[in-house]
Structures are given as C-alpha cells and as structure tokens.
Amino acid sequence: MKITVFKNFQDRKGNYELVKVLNAIKEGKFNKEITQLRNADSEEEKGRIKNSLLAFTPSVVLNTGRKFTDGDSYSGIIHLDYDKLNDVAGAIDKIKALEYTYSCFVSPSGDGIKVFVRVSNEMEQHKDAFNTLRSYYDKAVGRESDKSIKDLNRLCFVSSDPELYLNEESVVFDYTTVSTTRTPEELWEYTSRKETFTVGNRNNFIHFFACNA
C-alpha cells in the first residue's frame, strides 16, 4: 500500500510504502520536531512547527501534485482523526480492540489519535465507505472524529509514537456488508476468538466485548 509524502503541503517528496512511514513514526525519526511541537508555549508556535512537518496522503497515490489526476490511484486505506481527547490511552485501547484497525498512533499534538483501516471499496465509493467507517468507530470510541478528512487527497501529518500499533492481519472493512451495529451473539462470538472468559481474565473479556458493542 503506497502513499505520497509532501513537505510544506505542496512540495511532493515521492511515493512510499505506508508501512515505511509508520515505521519511521514508531522509530522516532520525527521525535525532535514532535517534542518541540508538544512543548511549544503558544498556539502560533505549535502551528508553525506542525505546518513544517512532513505529511502524507493515506488514501491516494499522487504522481504529480496535490490534485488528483487520471494517472493517480486509490490506496485502499481510510484514515480517521480523533482530537482533543481526555484519555488518549483509553481511546487507543478501544481502537486496538476493533478487528478492522490496521494501525493507529498518537497525533503530533499528543492529545489525539490517527487511525488507519484497510478497505475493499473502489475510489468512487470512498466517501460512502468513510462515513460508514467513521460511524462504526465513533460508536466504539465514544467520541466523534473529524468528519472533514473525508477528501481523497487529505493530508495526515507524521508524528512520533514508540507504541504505534500495526496489525498486518487486520480485517479489511467492506462498508456494504458491515453494519454499524452487531447482535450480542455476534459480539460474543468475536470476543471469544480474541479472549477467554476464565477466572483471572474475565475483566479483559468484558472490556473487549464492550469495546466492540
């Protein structure tokens, strides 16, 4: 799955495998800039530093500039953005518990989460798939994500997160068959494949079940 990396919003740096960018985030390649951003005294300074970060297009591969052309392609990835969370760690646990989560990491600001999900739809169905996926995740997380990032060429800034989550075995999301609600029986069956309802692990089982309810 390839994406396109930009500097200063418009300066195209090239096309790269998404996993390469994710590994760079996990390995701390951008740690210096992210630390400066999170420690900045003013919103103006934070904005300046953030805008200087590399950014990438999770959903498309762009071969010329920021605008989509005939030679460009769909990546098969949809990303969600949660911001200004009071409990980032708790929200990440809920996101990681979902079978569709391919990757997630703490945002540059430190109080948000970037989420990435592999999807089966074509580019023409991107917005419909985004809306369904967003509804599904927002219900699980208990918070509303940013609805404005539905655009195909929307950029996502890099970050620094040694605990970045990556699941190469994540289930591909099909918005035409996935319901935003599941029956209790379906939830119990899925949870049973991930956790055991045994002494010493019942709290983990119930927590996992609740995250997917």
Task: Please identify what each model-predicted range represents.
Residues K7, K13-Y16, E27, N31-A40, ...:
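Modules that initiate DNA replication and primer synthesis
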Residues E169-T176:
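Short, low-complexity export/processing leader segments characterized by acidic and small residues
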Residues S103-S109, D146-D151:
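Short beta-strand
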Residues F116-E122, K147-E169:
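Short, conserved secondary-structure transition motifs
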Residues E33-I34, N39-I49, L53:
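Small cysteine-rich, disulfide-bonded extracellular modules of the LU/uPAR three-finger superfamily
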Residues K50-F68:
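Short, solvent-exposed beta-alpha or beta-beta edge segments that form flexible loop/patches at the rim
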Residues M1-T4:
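Boundary/junction segments of secreted and surface-exposed precursor proteins
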